[in-house]
From Swiss-Prot:
It comes from Nandina domestica. Pfam families: Proton_antipo_C, Proton_antipo_M, Proton_antipo_N. GO terms for cellular component: chloroplast thylakoid membrane. One of its GO terms (molecular function) is quinone binding. This is NAD(P)H-quinone oxidoreductase subunit 5, chloroplastic. Its EC number is 7.1.1.-. It is found in: Plastid, Chloroplast thylakoid membrane.
Length: 741
């Protein structure tokens, strides 16, 4: 066992040979390197699998009751200061290692087929391997300096991955937005690290916790300064995990390839912020104001993320806001001190969200054979619908991921979210009400995504989307100004209508005529793909993409059982509590996670009822009515006879506009900060060029003309020099005489 821990330092370095070899190979032997590109994908999966096996062994040792292991190498700079580097293996590290490696392997296998058509295939796997290495280094770090180094590397990898298609202006802008937003958080994190070094004189976690506790007990530190430093540390996590108000980069990060989105949202970048708060939670717990701040940010993010997801049309951006909201639950749990529930939800959400993102990638991949390569179209749920019969395996996987995120038992997220909701009632009834209401919103917008994508008819075959005039396939009215107006006026919280009620879909069916079929055949050729097959209908993805989906389905079905909170009949399923026992004792020394069946069912009934309510409302509004209800007249008469119909339409329009425009937060940031900073920069530029440069240039020009004047005065005659000398002497004598009167 000791040998296992002694060699744990190698974990972050195992994936590095792939990006190094690819980089050197492309420089020295580019042709051979490109011809063996599948080998690099296999090597990436193999190396990460080795780490997964190693991490599983470490986790087993932790479950058996092994203590925390830390190995440190000291680098002495002088007698007063030294830097220590090493690695820390504890329950939190073990959980994160398993999470990163399992999700990473699934994403790499999936990417082999998904990126097979892309010319940047090798660059993609180099970035992915380096990103995995950076995240592994982050979770094994034993001090704040190491964490900050790998923190920046994770941010750099995310910048490269989000901007992978950097030739697209929107992708280049998205990676810059993510980079700048995270610089705000990173600056706060750096200030917090320096502040705690000033307070404690150490970067090590153990010293940091012990010294801070002693100083708090003895009153040896200014509590306001300590709170400020701890809040600055948390600012880094706010930006990394896309919490309010530094969440604006997350939806734009969807401009990268879909496997990148799955990795960032499940196991790397956004998980890094949660990991940082979990790692420093013993420090935060002694500062009540910081814990309240963490829970406040969490509950705001929960509600904001859910409301912003309500009216999104892009399937990946909808999932991005879902990630934002679900990580808000995790942050809320950490702020409440529910360490176990927070990590439990981080695990269950990671597998469910990886399944959903890879499922959305399969959907996008199938839609590209119909629509062509255009992310704006292939990711838009307006053009989907009726995919059940075309991609049945993807549909089943996506449905299970959706139900899991909705909180339907016995899927993974049900167990963790239910635990957070129960703890929230003990912490704050107001927070609990908001969290429960948002659980219903989550079920609503997730099932909305599912219904718009898989139910009804394939909308990409419609020749006319607005129902007003004919348009060509690549000038669909919804993408233009007129179509946008029609949608805004006639559709509320719905992505399509045909001059029908805002609440209901049209009963009409739309047969595909010959002109549309001919038009489709001429437009579906995808020149960027090596596979030149064309089809007027989507098709199921290849087995290489379906295999990770099926494995993640198993995780979604069964990973929740590691944290079942009840112990009956001598059967203890709660593996998670066994693994986290050393960390839980640090915060809740007298806690008992086990509950009986009656208490569990009572607590779960309320949350499941809320989830089913959200699903029912989504089905009522977004499921095609001709497949759900026989009595259409009854429903339509109910809608028309309502005396407050206009009032409710106005309210729903406000909600729709709020959601679709991202809560106007991006507009506010653009107007206030971006344009404000640019205005200040232009003012400084004007002052520099006109005032500073004007003074400098003015002195130079004045000196030049004075010199020119003197040049003409000095003609070489001694009498002229004598005259000027006597003239200036006389002037100085007069001045002297005047001031001495």
């Amino acid at each position: 066992m000791e040998h296992t821990y002694q060699y744990a330092w190698i974990i972050p370095f195992v994936p590095l040979p792939v990006p190094i070899a690819i980089g050197v190979g492309l420089l020295l032997v580019p042709t051979a390197t490109k011809s063996l590109r599948r080998m690099w994908a296999f090597l990436s999966v193999l190396l990460l699998s080795i780490i997964m096996i190693f991490s599983a062994d470490l986790s087993i040792q932790q479950i058996k009751g092994s203590l925390i292991h830390q190995y440190v190498w000291s680098w002495t700079i002088n007698n007063d200061f030294s830097l220590e580097f090493g690695y820390l293996i504890d329950p939190l590290t073990s959980i994160m290692l398993i999470l990163i490696t399992t999700v990473g392997i699934m994403v790499l296998i999936y990417s082999d087929n998904y990126m097979s058509h892309d010319q940047g295939y090798l660059r993609f796997f180099a970035y992915m391997s380096f990103s995995n290495a950076s995240m592994l280094g982050l979770v094994t770090s034993c001090n704040l300096i190491q964490i900050y180094i790998f923190w920046e590397l994770v941010g750099m990898c995310s910048y490269l991955l989000i901007g992978f298609w950097f030739t697209r202006p929107i992708a280049a802008s998205a990676c810059q937005k993510a980079f700048v937003t995270n610089r705000v958080g990173d600056f706060g994190l750096l200030l917090g690290i320096l502040g705690f070094y000033f307070i404690t004189g150490s970067f090590e976690f153990r010293d940091l916790f012990e010294i801070t506790n002693n100083l708090m007990d003895n009153g040896g530190v200014n509590s306001l300064f300590l709170t400020l430093c701890a809040s600055l540390l948390f600012v880094g996590a706010i930006a990394k995990s896309a919490q309010f108000p530094l969440h604006v980069w997350l939806p734009d990060a969807m401009e990268g390839p879909t496997p990148i989105s799955a990795l960032i949202h499940a196991a790397t970048m956004v998980a890094a912020g949660i990991f940082l708060v979990a790692r420093l939670l013993p420090l935060f717990t002694v500062i009540p104001y910081v814990m309240n701040f963490i829970s406040l940010i969490g509950i705001i993010t929960i509600l904001l993320g859910a409301t912003l997801a309500l009216a999104q049309r892009d399937i990946k951006r909808s999932l991005a806001y879902s990630t934002m909201s679900q990580l808000g639950y995790t942050m809320l749990a950490l702020g409440m001190g529910s360490y176990r529930a927070a990590l439990f939800h981080l695990i269950t959400h990671a597998y469910s969200k990886a399944l959903l993102f890879l499922g959305s990638g399969s959907i996008i991949h199938s839609m590209e054979t119909v629509i062509g390569y255009s992310p704006e179209k292939s990711q838009n749920m307006v053009l989907m619908g009726g995919l059940t019969k075309y991609v049945p395996i993807t549909k089943t996987a996506f449905l299970l991921g959706t139900l899991s995120l909705c909180g339907i038992p016995p899927l993974a997220c049900f167990w963790s979210k239910d635990e957070i909701l129960n703890d929230s009632w003990l912490y704050s009834p107001i927070f609990a009400i908001i969290a429960c209401f948002t659980a219903g919103l989550t079920a609503f917008y997730m099932f909305r995504m599912y219904l718009l994508t898989f139910e009804g008819h394939l909308n990409a075959h419609f020749q006319n989307y607005s129902g007003k005039k004919n348009s060509s396939f690549y000038s669909i009215s919804i993408w233009g100004k007129e179509g946008a107006k029609a949608i805004k006026q006639n559709s509320v919280l719905s992505t399509m209508n045909n001059n029908e009620s805002a609440y209901l879909f049209s009963k009409k069916t739309y047969p595909i005529d010959g002109n549309v079929r001919n038009m489709m055949r001429s437009l579906i050729t995808i020149t960027n793909f090596s596979n030149k097959k064309t089809s007027p209908y989507p098709h199921e993805s290849d087995n290489t993409m379906l295999l990770p989906l099926l494995i993640l389905v198993l995780f979604t079905l069964f990973v929740g059982f590691i944290g079942i909170p009840f112990d009956q009949g001598g059967i203890d399923f709660d593996i998670l509590s066994k693994l986290l026992t050393p960390s839980i004792n640090l915060l809740h020394s007298n806690s008992n996670n086990s509950v009986d069946w009656y208490e569990f069912v009572t607590n779960a009934f309320f949350s499941v009822s809320i989830a089913y309510s959200g699903i029912f409302i989504a089905s009522l509004l977004y499921r095609p009515v001709y497949s759900s209800f026989q009595n259409l007249d009854l429903i339509n008469s109910f809608v028309k006879m309502s005396p407050k119909r206009i009032f409710w339409d106005k309210i729903i329009n406000v909600i729709y506009n709020w959601s679709y425009n991202r809560g106007y937060i991006d507009v506010f940031y653009t107007t206030t900060f971006t344009r404000g900073i640019r205005g200040v920069a232009e003012l400084i530029y004007f002052f520099d060029r006109q005032v500073i440069d004007g003074i400098t240039n003015g002195v130079g020009i004045t000196s030049f003309f004075v010199g020119e004047g003197i040049k003409y005065v000095g003609g070489g005659r001694i009498s002229s020099y004598l005259f000027l000398y006597l003239f200036y002497v006389s002037i100085f004598l007069l001045i002297y005489y005047f001031f001495n009167l």
